[in-house]
Amino acid sequence: MTEPGASPEDPWVKASPVGAHAGEGRAGRARARRGAGRRGASLLSPKSPTLSVPRGCREDSSHPACAKVEYAYSDNSLDPGLFVESTRKGSVVSRANSIGSTSASSVPNTDDEDSDYHQEAYKESYKDRRRRAHTQAEQKRRDAIKRGYDDLQTIVPTCQQQDFSIGSQKLSKAIVLQKTIDYIQFLHKEKKKQEEEVSTLRKDVTALKIMKVNYEQIVKAHQDNPHEGEDQVSDQVKFNVFQGIMDSLFQSFNASISVASFQELSACVFSWIEEHCKPQTLREIVIGVLHQLKNQLY
């Protein structure tokens, strides 16, 4: 049975086995359905059955069996409904595959991938920060060294003097350090020399202070007794005092000295000075000589 509104000239009606046998009545349509079912089963089966061609078909194509064979192998044997349905299913499957692939490709990154990306970015930024900090510290260190060498050239006088062997070239760091070392050694020697001079001057100051005190006492004693010392002492009396002191010292000197060798003489002289030339011993000798002269004069 044809659909309402379909004309006999419709290609789908001509191509369909049911439409081709539309004029044969109910029996023809049933045969057409059975033939279409068998052909559909043969198409869906994994291996189509082999059709046997009668021997008479080779010579006479008008045989009914030959007509069936030709119909089975003709293009009109395909059911348009099956073709449309298979085409629709294939398009649906291909569309589903394309949607699945698109959805799979458009799946967003997971949390693990995002965390890995952020960790890598943090590591890169941390390395960059460390590299920049290291570069800045190295630049500061070099600037400090350069300023130190410039200060040395300014402070050390020998670095400021022009060396004819070098000419107008800039002094190298090795030359600056060597000149600085030489200048520091020179300053140490000068400091030691000045310390020795200061020590000598301090001793002189101490001796002058002692002499000042003694002179002040003499002046004070003369002011207290203005008439004392008016009578002058003769040169003979002075010589007698000196002679008495020397005679006493010579006696002890002659008893202590040995002239066997120069070394023994030197040793004896030093030992005699340390023993008989002490201030207390000399004072006793002078007082004894003055008492003797006083008794002789008065």
Swiss-Prot record:
Q: Which superkingdom?
A: Eukaryota
Query: Which residue windows does the record flag with biased composition (Basic residues)?
Result: 28-37
Q: Which UniProt keywords apply?
A: Activator, Cytoplasm, DNA-binding, Nucleus, Phosphoprotein, Repressor, Transcription, Transcription regulation
Identification of the protein by name: Max-like protein X
Say which species the protein is native to: Homo sapiens (Human)
Q: Where is the composition biased (Basic and acidic residues)?
A: 116-127, 135-145
Subunit structure of this chain's protein = Efficient DNA binding requires dimerization with another bHLH protein. Binds DNA as a heterodimer with MAD1, MAD4, MNT, WBSCR14 and MLXIP. Can also bind DNA as a homodimer.
Q: Name one GO biological process term.
A: negative regulation of DNA-templated transcription
Can you tell me where the transmembrane regions are? none
Q: Found in which tissues?
A: Expressed in all tissues tested, including spleen, thymus, prostate, ovary, intestine, colon, peripheral blood leukocyte, heart, liver, skeletal muscle and kidney. Lower levels of expression in testis, brain, placenta and lung.
